């Protein structure tokens, strides 16, 4: 079965596209732009939220989105309800990172090198603030409230829920 311009692929977070504006990103942008289908995705806990934030918020099918690659790759913002082909979709991406037993390290702290060395020696996974971990991985109170208001408009009944994590 061939996918067409009428088709959507939904990715439930950790897409990996928005990580760094490098040759890999450029390659994927060109590749996805040539596909007939549209990719819709919600944030995961492993996204570069600074990079995502560079794209303007827009309205699309009743909710807020960011067009990452024109009309081919579209980020569905948290707490939004979208009407697509006669069905309602509630998007709520994000999650708490589980691979941070070694901590969330900040290069700006004076003991960064020592913290990193300790985590490396203990073989504990860690993330680095604004490089491999962003506080925006978790929803804000505003996003939670907006999601509740949007669900209330639908009497808390939507056809599909698109999360990243259900735990």
What would you call each of these model-derived segments?
Residues 1-84:
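Core catalytic region of metal-dependent phosphoesterases/phosphodiesterases
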Residues 85-167:
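Active-site-proximal loop/helix segment associated with metal-binding centers of metalloenzymes
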